[in-house]
Amino acid sequence: MTQTPVKIAVTGAAGQICYSLLFRIASGSLLGDTPIELRLLEITPALKALEGVVMELDDCAFGNLVNIEIGDDPKKVFDGVNAAFLVGAMPRKAGMERSDLLTKNGAIFTAQGKALNDVAADDVRVLVTGNPANTNALIAATNAVDIPNNHFAALTRLDHNRAKTQLARKTGKTVNDVRHMTIWGNHSSTQYPDVFHAEVAGQKATNLVNEAWIENEFIPTVAKRGAAIIDARGASSAASAANATVECMRDWMGSTPEGDWVSMAIPSDGSYGVPEGLISSFPVTITNGKVEIVQGLDIDDFSRAKIDASAKELADERDAVKELGLI
């Protein structure tokens, strides 16, 4: 019996992140040999460019990619999808107020949330990469009234990966030696990369690095890495964001490695004092697609203040989109 293809929607499909992401998905980085059908959404002016991307996907002759559909109508593109990568978003431009950014993205994610609600498969998982990712995910989830909130998440895996690399470099080890890294809060400069539970080659990270490095180098480097990449290459991180996006959804559709956890922004259940309903990053384990927040971690005063500050920013963003009538 022929296996039914998994339908995967990707928005902003002609953009920079997707120029890396689509080829990773199609080559099997997400679901291995499982047959897939790509559903690609773009704004009308970008459809011509998207046709060129589809030509390149065709020219790769990926064995598990059985079909590609493109369009500018989310209700058509999202029909029956099992996974949705919401990558397309309005970037903040010079002189743009935060409320303008939230309004413009609010319109995008309101429409996409409603479309997913109406036509996506019952098992759909929705991962938001387009920034401000946490609040965009909240808007989409709130407008998808029939889809459980725990089917929505925002990407903090890129921050998680950045943090692992910085700790591995500092300790002279490899990223494979680093376990139990945690990102808390918002995917913004208030995020809190937490090494206090991390291990490097079986040793507590805090026995290998000092607090001055953690506070003055590690946290700012991870939190501001996106800006540093823009300064260096004149464009935002795309390939690394695509890689993290694939890794996050791959784990979400499967399981995290035994004995480790990952970071993922999901609707808070009140754990660690993060107000319920905010889409905030937590340490999570995943077993056969079921996501659970790691419980019982000791949070010292330093970490408490950092987690609270990022949660406050998320609450402020939620309140702002409420005032704008988006949720």
Swiss-Prot record:
Keywords, alphabetical: NAD, Oxidoreductase, Tricarboxylic acid cycle
PANTHER family xref list: MALATE DEHYDROGENASE
Binding site for NAD(+): 12-18, 105, 112, 129-131
Active-site positions on this chain: 187
Record EC number: 1.1.1.37
Catalytically driven reaction(s): (S)-malate + NAD(+) = oxaloacetate + NADH + H(+)
Function: Catalyzes the reversible oxidation of malate to oxaloacetate.
GO terms assigned for molecular function: L-malate dehydrogenase (NAD+) activity
Name the UniProt record assigns to this protein: Malate dehydrogenase
